[in-house]
Amino acid sequence: HHFGTEIDVSDAKAIPENYEVQLTTAECDGMFAPFHAWLSERIETGKSFGFTRVFVPGRGKIQPEKWHLSHLPTARKIQERFSESALKEIFERSEISCKEAILSEFPVLLQNYIYPYFI
């Protein structure tokens, strides 16, 4: 997950027998809707033990994911230590197949997929 400080959640009691959770918007708006309404209320009132949703409408290029929670106090510690140059160096030294595409679009990728989620 994004910074290593996230978890995906669902309501185990709402899962039908033999159903495999897909983590989709349809599930969140369907069988998991009561759970996500409860969770939203907890987040909005500061009763979520530091967990929040970062993939929300209007933030960055990652589609909203109600099930994806970030532990904000821990994520912020990592964000404070984030280094563009260190990340770029990792890609430069890597054997990843799309390295040139990543490096050529590096500033755009940071602006669309990294920095919007620093909250």
Q: What are these regions, as identified by a protein language model?
A:
Residues 1-119:
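Cell-envelope/glycan interface and biosynthesis
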